[in-house]
Amino acid sequence: MEHEVVSALAAFTQRYVDCWQQEKGHLPASEALYGIPSPCIVENHEDTVYWSPQPFAPAAALDGVERALEISLHPDVHAFYTAQYAGDMAAQFDSLSCQLLQVWSEDDFTRMQENLIGHLLTQKRLKLTPTLFLATTDSEMTMVSLCNISGEIILEEFGTKKRQILAPTLAAFLFGLNPLAV
């Protein structure tokens, strides 16, 4: 049976691609990802890469993060980061604009794990409960994260205990996202 997060992420990604097709007349495009190898690349044109999501292969999990910190990660975060390769996706959740973080390639998956380890080490040092980032916001100090203990999706201020619950689960958060073609 497919994990609920995988289904919710696939549904959001399809809404995102459809939004780009309807508003821009082409696949999602990025200048920031131009020149970076990925199985997602459909076409490079001038300084822009046009991409389409691809299945994550070979099968993987965030085992490196778990081993490095001797911690068990919430199953939702494994599903989220290993379901597909894609570019980051702009979205809105209620009035919150965010960039849903995605894995672009196998190399990017390694980098993402290193960043998650750094994030969790900082939280441990500050004696904060563990969270795993999922999206960036317009502010460099706030991010959308998954609480590793409850599975809730929260808006957190980096390095502080300041947290606001956005959704009870990652699947609920993904189903509540509206794509933005920017």
UniProtKB/Swiss-Prot annotation:
Record's GO cellular component terms: cytoplasmic side of plasma membrane
Main location: membrane
Stored Gene3D superfamilies: Syd protein (3.40.1580.20)
Keyword Protein biosynthesis: no
CDD domains: Syd
Alphabetized UniProt keyword annotations: Cell inner membrane, Cell membrane, Membrane
One Pfam family in the UniProt entry: Syd
Localisation: Cell inner membrane
Keyword Hydrolase: no
Record's bilayer topology term: Peripheral membrane protein
Family indicated by similarity: Belongs to the Syd family.
Function: Interacts with the SecY protein in vivo. May bind preferentially to an uncomplexed state of SecY, thus functioning either as a chelating agent for excess SecY in the cell or as a regulatory factor that negatively controls the translocase function.
Protein's UniProt name: Protein Syd
Lineage: Bacteria, Pseudomonadati, Pseudomonadota, Gammaproteobacteria, Enterobacterales
